[in-house]
């Protein structure tokens, strides 16, 4: 449409979350084909994609006219509700599903003076999404510097938790939070794998940049007494250890 936002994308499924009962009452009709109007999640993903493309163009020294600033302005006009400090689900809605606030924070286009309110909301709500969107929630909070809350959500219990999978005997990752939470739940599904990247990259601070000599910053809470993990990264092995109050990261060449 004229302001650059997407509406009535009928070429495929407008995925917000799955199963449907974990969309936090997202206030937009997600029928096939999609209903009339402009909704939040697909536009947040679109802006994220445009910003990623612009980053690649910069890295390649290509000349281009940035589109993302105008898209962010249009997104704010359509979905931001100053009376709550949150993003709404659709252009005409007053409801703010957690999904509608996870993605703007994750993709980094929430204005600096609005970030704390959005991050607080994600913490207050806890995990009320499916395993798919939980990845973006944890990553968004990490990018907002809320590492203690990330670790708490990652290791917490309840019906919507990875601990619930373990309590049900999981040896891999389920497609849903529990075997009976979806009628045909796969008991080995990669879209529940948020703990892998979040623990390694955001909590332990092990990234390719660190392996190449950048400053290493761990965000593992002091309450964790012992942890040891070996992570293959950038042609090396990163050995992370927390023991007796000491935290170390040793880079070993693969032999």
Residue ranges and their predicted role:
Residues 2-67, 73, 80-134:
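The feature captures the catalytic groove of carbohydrate-active enzymes
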Residues 127-157:
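Repeat-solenoid scaffold signature
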Residues 73, 148-255:
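Non-catalytic C-terminal accessory modules of carbohydrate-active enzymes
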Residues 55-58, 73-80, 142-143, 155-159, ...:
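Sec-exported extracytoplasmic/periplasmic mature domains
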Residues 107-110, 141, 203:
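Generic structural signal for hydrophobic core residues of well-folded globular domains
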């Amino acid at each position: 449409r004229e302001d650059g936002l997407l509406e009535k994308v009928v070429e495929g499924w407008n995925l917000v979350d799955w199963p449907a009962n974990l969309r936090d009452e997202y206030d937009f009709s997600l029928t096939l084909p999609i209903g009339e109007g402009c909704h939040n999640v697909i536009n947040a993903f679109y802006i994220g994609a445009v910003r990623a493309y612009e980053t690649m163009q910069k890295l390649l020294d290509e000349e281009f006219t940035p589109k993302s600033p105008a898209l962010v302005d249009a997104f704010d006009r359509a979905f931001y509700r100053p009376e709550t400090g949150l993003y709404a689900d659709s252009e005409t809605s007053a409801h703010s599903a957690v999904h509608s606030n996870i993605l703007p924070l994750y993709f980094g286009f929430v204005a600096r003076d609005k970030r704390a309110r959005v991050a607080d909301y994600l913490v207050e709500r806890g995990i009320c999404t499916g395993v798919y969107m939980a990845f973006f929630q944890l990553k968004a909070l990490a990018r907002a510097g809320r590492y203690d809350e990330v670790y708490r959500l990652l290791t917490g219990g309840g019906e919507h938790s990875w601990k619930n999978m373990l309590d049900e005997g999981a040896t891999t990752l389920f497609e849903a939070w529990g075997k009976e939470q979806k009628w045909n739940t796969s008991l080995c599904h990669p879209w529940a794998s948020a703990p892998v990247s979040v623990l390694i990259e955001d909590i332990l601070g092990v990234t390719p940049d660190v392996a190449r000599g950048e400053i290493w910053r761990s965000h593992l809470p002091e309450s964790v007494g012992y942890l040891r993990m070996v992570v293959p990264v950038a042609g090396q092995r990163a050995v992370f250890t927390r023991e007796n109050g000491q935290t170390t990261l040793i880079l070993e060449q693969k032999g």
